[in-house]
């Protein structure tokens, strides 16, 4: 079985944020995830919109790294983030139960996601001390390896009247 392919969508807020995203993507690759990141997969002369469209449709999952700037750009439809939002909104409308998109929070202020992701459960990576726990939750989702298996349904403890002892 091939490792899950994961496209990482983020805004280029600062050099330190880009470095965090690069380290995050490297960690995913080191733990069995085929992470796709512009910092590795794009070079001068490549077509950015084509890259985004291709990876958004080709990937098994899309991780959206939500910062204040990311949320602002997505909600306003600006830049690459706005373009990706347009593609993902269309995809989400086609399949309402789509769990392909996983928002992660990387903010210093109030945790927030773009409006179009408002119904999605997110993972909060804003506190570095909880990063291993949150990474474990994310990896379990991407690798379909839940922490707890849902138990099988047992048999009905009640028997129908016509099969029970009538003398009781």
Residue ranges and their predicted role:
Residues 67-68, 109:
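Flexible loop residues that form catalytic
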Residues 1-30, 75, 96-168:
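C-terminal interaction surface of TIR/SEFIR-family domains
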Residues 62-63:
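Inter-motif core of Ras-like GTPase G domains
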Residues 23-53, 68-77, 81:
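Conserved BB-loop
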Residues 59:
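An anion/phosphate-binding loop that grips the pyrophosphate of nucleotide cofactors and donors
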Residues 52-56, 113-115:
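Short glycine-biased active-site loop of nucleotidyltransferases that positions the nucleotide triphosphate
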Residues 83-99:
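Arginine/glycine-rich "motif VI" loop of SF2 helicases in the C-terminal RecA-like domain
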Residues 79-84, 130:
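Short acidic-hydrophobic sequence patches enriched in Asp/Glu that either
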């Amino acid at each position: 079985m091939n490792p899950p392919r994961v496209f990482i969508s983020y805004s280029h807020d600062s050099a330190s944020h880009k470095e965090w995203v690069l380290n995050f993507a490297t960690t995913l690759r080191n733990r069995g995830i085929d992470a796709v990141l512009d910092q590795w997969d794009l070079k001068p002369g490549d077509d950015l919109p084509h890259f985004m469209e291709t990876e958004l449709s080709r990937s098994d999952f899309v991780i959206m790294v939500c910062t204040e700037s990311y949320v602002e750009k997505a909600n306003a439809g600006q830049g690459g983030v706005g373009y990706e939002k347009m593609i993902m909104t269309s995809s989400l409308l086609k399949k309402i139960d789509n769990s392909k998109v996983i928002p992660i929070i990387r903010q210093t202020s109030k945790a927030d996601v773009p409006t179009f992701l408002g119904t999605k459960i997110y993972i909060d990576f804003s506190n570095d001390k909880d990063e291993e726990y949150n990474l474990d939750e994310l990896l379990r989702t991407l690798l379909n390896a839940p922490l707890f298996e849902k138990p099988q349904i047992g048999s009905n403890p009640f028997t129908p009247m016509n099969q029970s002892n009538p003398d009781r």
